[in-house]
């Protein structure tokens, strides 16, 4: 396999995927501007309404990862499929094919070029139960994150307020590495347009989504990984976490 920390890759992808299916309740600090708070509340309200109507979702994505100390960002693209509760298919198609499949707590990471599949439990690979609970709809983002207006630019396309999610817990690998998440939504539909994951190390992974389609009746077989007979199965490392 490529020399990637797949526990970090899976953790980042799952946080991103869960943010595509947000279950939000507003929480913010007292010192934030009242006008900004009002706008954030409205975005959260619309996101909640969208979530409640969405049973499955598919989209194209472009990912740009900026690594601290490297001049050029890494760009990739592909497709993502999500179905409640707890099903995810995340396909990288360019510049190379790499697939992540999640069925509740079971995770498979398949790289056809290397004829290997990494298998494990999400709660072990992500060092936290939060991504699994969020993907299954059993938890709210506000239970893991404080939600507040985004400083600086503050607004996205169409003048819609950006949301910043700040981790409440610094326990586990995910809690120690993730500094904040910034969400941008599409005007009118309030589907997620962009998600940016900022790490304490200075690394930034940004995902932009397009061609979103919801409630298409995605079948369970779409989320089943079919492997050739000659693929080597590798067990994922177990991380200690909450």
Model-inferred region functions:
Residues 10-22:
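Bacterial N-terminal signal peptides
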Residues 1-6:
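N-terminal secretory signal peptides that target proteins for export/translocation
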Residues 79-130, 205-206:
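An acidic-aromatic
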Residues 67-69, 87-88, 96-99, 109, ...:
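Short beta-strands and strand-coil junctions in structured, solvent-facing domains, enriched
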Residues 24-72, 227-242:
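N-terminal leader/targeting segments and the immediate start of mature chains
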């Amino acid at each position: 396999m490529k020399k990637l920390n797949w526990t970090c890759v899976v953790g980042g992808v799952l946080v991103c995927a869960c943010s595509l299916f947000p279950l939000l309740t507003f929480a913010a600090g007292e010192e934030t501007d009242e006008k900004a708070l009002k706008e954030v509340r409205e975005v959260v309200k619309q996101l909640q309404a969208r979530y409640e109507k969405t049973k499955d979702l598919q989209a194209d994505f472009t990912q740009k990862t900026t690594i601290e100390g490297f001049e050029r960002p890494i760009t990739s693209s592909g497709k993502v499929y999500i179905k409640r509760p707890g099903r995810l298919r995340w396909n990288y198609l360019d510049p190379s094919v790499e697939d992540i499949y999640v069925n509740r707590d079971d995770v498979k990471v398949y790289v056809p070029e290397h004829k290997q599949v990494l298998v494990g439990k999400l709660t072990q690979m992500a060092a936290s139960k939060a991504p699994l609970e969020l993907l299954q709809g059993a938890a709210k983002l506000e239970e893991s994150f404080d939600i507040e207006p985004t400083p600086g630019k503050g607004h996205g396309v169409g003048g819609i307020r950006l949301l910043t999610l700040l981790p409440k817990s610094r326990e586990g690998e995910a809690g120690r590495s993730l500094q904040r998440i910034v969400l941008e939504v599409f005007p009118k539909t309030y589907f997620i347009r962009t998600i940016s994951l900022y790490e304490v190390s200075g690394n930034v992974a940004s995902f932009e989504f397009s061609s979103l389609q919801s409630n298409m009746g995605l079948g369970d077989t779409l989320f089943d990984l079919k492997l050739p007979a000659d693929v080597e199965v590798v067990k994922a490392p177990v991380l200690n976490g909450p």
